[in-house]
Amino acid sequence: MSKQNELNARRKQRVRARIKKYGSGRPRLSVFRSSKHIYAQIIDDTAGHTLAAASSLDKDLREGLKTGADIDAAKAVGKLIAERATAKGVTAVVFDRGAYLFHGRVKALADAAREAGLQF
């Protein structure tokens, strides 16, 4: 494993440990960012199930997006994940940014999810 990959894995582990310690049993909104797309899942760690998921690859979003790798796509995914979560009865979550900095696409997704009704 390269040094950078090792550091990213450590940061991801550290963030997840803090979430589990202070999350108080709420589901977590996990974000994965690739070079071409962005993905979001709401995961119930106590049961080990994914409650809702959305990505820039969803048919609902693909037609309206220029690309899946920009801030507009992240905002659309954030809004969609919030709508799907509230439909399942989830209103409060813990944001899991993983190893990513809270900046750019990750921040845009979080802000859009907050505006659409998720609390974190």
UniProtKB/Swiss-Prot annotation:
Annotated Gene Ontology cellular component terms: cytosolic large ribosomal subunit
Coiled-coil region(s): none
GO MF annotation list: 5S rRNA binding; structural constituent of ribosome
Protein's GO biological process: translation
InterPro entries in the cross-refs: Ribosomal_uL18_bac-type, Ribosomal_uL18_bac/euk
Domain of life, per lineage: Bacteria
Cross-referenced SUPFAM superfamilies: Translational machinery components
Keywords of the record: Ribonucleoprotein, Ribosomal protein, RNA-binding, rRNA-binding
Keyword Ribosomal protein included in the entry's annotation: yes
UniProt subunit comment: Part of the 50S ribosomal subunit; part of the 5S rRNA/L5/L18/L25 subcomplex. Contacts the 5S and 23S rRNAs.
General function of this protein: This is one of the proteins that bind and probably mediate the attachment of the 5S RNA into the large ribosomal subunit, where it forms part of the central protuberance.
Protein family: Belongs to the universal ribosomal protein uL18 family.
Protein name according to UniProt: Large ribosomal subunit protein uL18
Species annotation: Rhodospirillum centenum (strain ATCC 51521 / SW)
The gene coding this protein: rplR
